[in-house]
Regions:
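Charge-rich, intrinsically disordered N-terminal extensions
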Residues: 1-119, 125-158
Length: 158
């Protein structure tokens, strides 16, 4: 059993985590507002903007805050993990279409981040290359994951 000091430390850590998440969610909301305006200025329609922002809200406020408190800039390194694994497992609506849509949303979002110099140009270039190279693998993974005839261990061996 954990000592009183250990339990207090865990509560403090949890409280710090919750406070950090709350702050990041506020920052993310402001960033998504800026992103939405950027998309509108680029000529995208309201439904498309809403779709991109919904996809990004899930990525920013669920995936990046799931086990850690990662900023959107930190998250550029985790897009592959999100699209190729986490999204497929955690989003009950995951399918080939939604993986492609999320890839497009993330690509646009990180283009916006790069334009604003919130990430380095080489990080954005690496992200685009990763999406280009890995998208077929991610689509295959989601197809296998959603196929009741496929053994789960064949998709993600333990």
């Amino acid at each position: 059993m954990a000592s009183t000091d250990e339990r207090t430390l865990m509560l403090d850590d949890e409280s710090d985590y919750d406070i950090r998440c709350q702050q990041l969610r506020q920052d993310n909301a402001a960033l998504l507002g800026d992103f939405s305006r950027w998309l509108k200025k680029a000529g995208l329609g309201a439904a498309t903007i809403r779709s991109h922002c919904t996809n990004l809200d899930f990525y920013l406020n669920h995936f990046l805050l799931y086990a850690d408190t990662l900023t959107p800039a930190d998250g550029v390194c985790y897009v592959g993990e999100f699209l190729g694994d986490w999204f497929i497992h955690k989003a009950m609506w995951s399918n080939k279409t939604t993986v492609k849509a999320n890839a497009a949303s993330l690509k646009k979002f990180y283009a916006f981040m790069a334009e604003r110099e919130l990430i380095k140009p080489e990080e954005f270039a690496s992200l685009k290359q990763q999406i280009k190279d890995k998208l077929p693998d991610w689509l295959g993974a989601v197809e296998r994951y959603n196929d009741p005839e496929v053994d789960f261990e064949d998709v993600w061996p333990i």
